[in-house]
C-alpha cells in the first residue's frame, strides 16, 4: 500500500513505515511448524507475531487471498485462535502438496467458513433484504457454491488479534481509538477494500459496523455501500434473527432484544437497497 494512501487514511504515525506481512515471507515457517503442539494463543511461535502493544497481540494468518471480482463482502471482527490454527494447517497441507500460492491461499481462507447454524442464518438474513435480487441469483445460498465468485469473506482486523491471550471480541479495547488496531485495519482491510470498491459490504455485528463507518470517513469505503443493521448470524443471536426475519412477534421479545431498533434497522436497509434499485419484497 502506497504511503500517500496510508497518510490520507490517517495511519497512526508510529506504524506509518511498516510493511504489511505477505504469505511469501511466512511460507517456509508455515511449512516447518508443528501446529499440533500449539494449543493456545500464548504458544503461537514468536516469528508469527506482527505487533504487540500492552495487552494486545496481532499474529500473521495466511488470509492474503482477495476475490477482486466479488460483488458482496461479508466482514467479521477478527479470526479467532481456532480459525488461525485451521488456516495454518490448510496452508501447510497446500505447501506440501505443491499447490500454487493463489489456490493454497484461497483454500486456507475458506476452511470452515460459516459452518454450523451461522450459514443458514446468514443466507436467510441476506435474502430478506433482497441481496440475492441485487446479485441476480436465486438465493444467497449459492454464494457458498456455484456463485462463490460473487462473495469475498474477510475481517475488519484480518490478522488474528488476542487480548490477554484471548480472542478479541471488539469490545475492549476500542479498535477505533487504539493505534495498533487502527494500523491493522488500515494495513490489511483497507488494502482489500481498495481492490473491491464497487461491492456491497455486510458488517457482522455493531462493532464491525462502527469500524466500517470509521473507515468510510477516511475514504476507504463508500458509506452508501455498507449494509448496516443485519443481525450477527450466530446461533447465540437467535431471537434478534427471528424478529428481523418476521418469525417472532414483537410482543414476545425478551428484554434483551430491542425490537424498535431492529425495526429501524430494517427500514434503513430497505431504503439503502431501494437506492441501489432493489424494491422491498411485497
Locate the predicted segments by residue.
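Active-site glycine-centered loops adjacent to acidic/histidine catalytic or metal-binding residues
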Residues: 232
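Long, compositionally biased interface segments
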Residues: 228, 237-238
